[in-house]
Amino acid sequence: MIKKLFQKLLLKSGKSYTLDSNIPTSLIVQILFKRFIMLLRGYLKTHKRVFLDRNCILLNKKNIKFGKNVTIEHNVKIDGFCKETIQFGNNSKIGAYSWISCTSHLSKFGVGFKIGNNSGVGKFTEFGASGGIEIGNDVIMGSYISFHSENHNFNDNSKLIREQGVTSIGIKIGNNVWVGAKVTFLDGCAIGNNCVVAAGAVVKDIFPDNVIIGGIPAKILKEIK
């Protein structure tokens, strides 16, 4: 009975997969209890239907907009001090120990961060969103991924690099993208729709739809037909 109820809850929340028959009922009860506590904590802190785990920090909450059924795992920090509204799409997820940093220095007010519907990132992901990060719908990502949406200027030999300021273009990822673990995204890069990014890649360029990319720096390895 509990399994059937859990399956109905999955379908209602937009999850299309079928529950494995080998999953014990005790695990389902444990998950339901944890999700209930997270939902209660999220509602008390945001007044929205957000599943918020323990030890999370939300800075400038009024500039953070949550869709339905957003999950923020434990020990996540979200910096809402930025020019644009931080947006989390429906059923999106941020893995534990991740950090969204929008304004890292008082010399530049950051742009912001957006993630679409049904998109999720794994644990220990760093979003340097001062130059802006946009992630589309149905994007799945592994752990230990980093985004760096600005670059330090270094062309003036008469000044220290740290005194030359920064430039930023932003980072964009399309819809239906799979990103492997430990990928690094550099400022100005963009990934098209229906793409795969191999684990460990360093992405600095703009890539079209329907490709598999990988390597340092990342290059097109194969087209998806």
Task: Give the positions of each predicted feature.
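Terminal amphipathic alpha-helical/low-complexity segments used for targeting or macromolecular assembly
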Residues: 1-49, 138, 144-145, 149-159, ...
